[in-house]
């Protein structure tokens, strides 16, 4: 297990998020989540322009072990997706906090960031798993 990046906020459903320089919320899954899933075979990305609520299912990942729904840590409009994952889903396994990002949102309510976990709190959650 890698050290959790401290600049990210975490959902208890194992997604991470941070705000980029344009104010968009960049979303991915944690190293814990990708390890639990195993080798990814397919990524079903959301549609750009989709409007999503915090905690709502937005996409899915298929691995050699199972299919898993991904939930949005914030409400907002999808403004970008990582299309490189369509040909290289293994990037989520290899670079969960970097090149394996999933999608970007234009967030509707930044106060929702307060609902998310710090790296320390998320580590406590996964230590109980």
UniProtKB/Swiss-Prot annotation:
SUPFAM superfamilies listed in its UniProt record: Single hybrid motif
Keywords: Lipoyl
Coiled-coil regions listed: none
Extent of the signal sequence: none
Cofactor: binding details: Binds 1 lipoyl cofactor covalently.
One GO cellular component term noted in the UniProt record for this chain: cytosol
Record's keyword annotation contains Magnesium: no
Domain Lipoyl-binding, chain residue ranges per copy: 24-106
Cofactor(s) the record lists: (R)-lipoate
Modified residues (N6-lipoyllysine): 65
GO biological process: glycine decarboxylation via glycine cleavage system
Protein's UniProt keywords contain NAD: no
PROSITE patterns from the UniProt entry: BIOTINYL_LIPOYL (PS50968), LIPOYL (PS00189)
Family assignment from sequence similarity: Belongs to the GcvH family.
Function as written in the Swiss-Prot or TrEMBL entry: The glycine cleavage system catalyzes the degradation of glycine. The H protein shuttles the methylamine group of glycine from the P protein to the T protein.
Subunit structure comment from the entry: The glycine cleavage system is composed of four proteins: P, T, L and H.
Protein's name in the database: Glycine cleavage system H protein
């Amino acid at each position: 297990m890698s050290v959790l990046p401290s600049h990210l906020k975490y959902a208890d459903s194992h997604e991470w998020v941070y705000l980029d320089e344009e104010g968009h919320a960049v979303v991915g899954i944690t190293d814990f989540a990708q390890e639990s899933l195993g080798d990814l075979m397919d990524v079903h990305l959301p549609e750009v322009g989709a409007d999503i609520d915090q905690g709502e299912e937005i996409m899915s990942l298929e691995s050699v072990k199972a299919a898993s729904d991904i939930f949005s840590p914030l409400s907002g409009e999808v403004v970008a997706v990582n299309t490189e994952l369509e040909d290289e889903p293994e990037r989520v396994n290899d670079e969960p906090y970097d090149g394996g990002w999933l999608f970007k949102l234009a967030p509707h309510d930044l106060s929702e960031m307060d609902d998310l976990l710090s790296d320390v709190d998320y580590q406590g959650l996964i230590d109980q798993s």
